[in-house]
Regions:
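Glycine-rich beta-strand-centered segment in the early N-terminal region that forms part
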Residues: 22-39, 49-92
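NAD(P)H dinucleotide-binding glycine-rich loop of Rossmann-like/cofactor-binding domains
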Residues: 86-147, 159
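NAD(P)H cofactor-binding loop motif with strongest signal on the N-terminal glycine-rich segment
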Residues: 147-148, 216
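Hydrophobic/small residue at the entry helix of a nucleotide-binding pocket
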Residues: 152
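Adenosine-nucleotide cofactor-binding segment
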Residues: 161-220, 271-273
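Glycine-rich phosphate-binding loop and adjacent beta-alpha segment
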Residues: 163, 219-290, 324
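C-terminal hydrophobic helical "lid"/dimerization subdomain
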Residues: 272-324
């Protein structure tokens, strides 16, 4: 049996079904991987609910780590028996084994566990492109990072500290703020008790920040724009509170010639060479100790419904994985 989590209709976590789906043999440019652990991310929720529409029925999951069982013709960068990890389209990582394109499958160093590998690829490479591929950031710059105690946020806190970048985080409780501070945030604002826009201005002496990195979406968008200094960059890379509504682009000029972008990881890792380079950079950060991967929750694959419920209810900190 090859347990695989699929959805046949969009909706709540009750739409997650475990079925037996044969993995098959890899074709040209493909590999078959026996998974040891799978990562859980908010994009999986977006896909399950239909916010990011998929053709149905569809297996879910965007990242995992495991061992290569078979390789197809033309695959040269990994071989049978290699430890690997990936974050990649198409979805389908919530399973015991799968056949998938090899281009975004990355050799996993022995120093990094399968659990860490499954927990870090999508979130870690997201941080890599946010700090190195979206807008130039230099030592001494200041970043406002929403959801700083989540999986992406805790990696970002550590990454920023390792590169001399001041990170101001936001989180929904004092406990989560302390977690962000413990991982390298210079400041963290509890948005349930303080107005983050006003607090950012206070912390920056009225200047604002160079860059905002926002995965929350609708509820933080306006305040994020108002937290930027003139010529600042707004990076909106998620919609946890709902999608950003349409707005008048003239606001960007009125607020100080601001810039805005809506990147996705899968554009950045679309080329094999870029993906492998980004993964090597991430692995080096982890092996050096600059970044520690915090796995806050582990669920068995059979408990995927409970895992989604915890993620949507914002009861999670750090990364969440499914063990196989």
């Amino acid at each position: 049996m090859n347990k695989t989590v699929v959805i046949k209709e969009f909706g709540g976590s009750d739409q997650l079904k475990i079925v037996d789906m044969p993995a098959g043999e890899p074709g040209d440019g493909q590999v078959r991987i026996a998974h040891k652990a799978c990562g859980l991310n908010y994009i999986d929720v977006y896909q399950r609910t239909g916010l990011y529409p998929l053709s149905l029925p569809q297996a879910l999951g965007m990242e995992a780590a495991g061992v290569i069982e078979a390789v197809g013709a033309g695959v040269t960068h990994v071989k049978v028996g290699d430890r690997v990890a990936y974050a990649s389209m198409p979805p389908g990582s919530y399973c015991e084994r799968r056949v998938m394109p090899a281009a975004q499958v990355c050799p996993l160093p022995d120093e990094i566990s399968f659990e860490q590998g499954a927990a870090m690829m999508l979130q870690g490479m997201t941080v890599q492109y946010l700090f190195h591929r979206t807008t130039p950031l230099s030592k001494g710059d200041t970043v406002l990072f929403h959801a700083a105690a989540g999986g992406v946020g805790l990696i970002a806190c550590q990454w920023a500290k390792s590169e001399g970048i001041t990170l101001i985080g936001t989180a929904g409780s004092d406990e989560k703020c302390q977690l962000a501070l413990d991982h390298g945030a210079m400041h963290c604002i509890n948005y349930t008790t303080e107005n983050f826009e006003e607090k950012v201005k206070e912390l920056t002496g009225g200047a604002g920040v160079d860059v905002v990195m926002d995965s929350v979406g609708e509820s933080t968008f306006e305040g994020s724009l108002n937290s930027l200094k003139p010529l600042g960059m707004m990076i909106t890379f998620g919609n946890a509170s709902g999608p950003v509504p349409p707005f008048n682009l003239a606001q960007l000029g009125a607020k100080g010639s601001l810039k805005i972008t809506r990147p996705t990881l899968f554009t950045h890792i679309g080329k094999h060479e870029d993906c492998q380079e980004m993964a090597r950079h991430l692995f080096s950060k982890v092996i050096s100790g600059d970044v520690k991967i915090v796995i806050g929750q582990e669920f068995a694959l059979d408990d995927v419904t409970a895992a989604h419920d915890a993620l949507e209810a914002r009861r999670t900190t750090g990364s969440t994985i499914l063990t196989v």
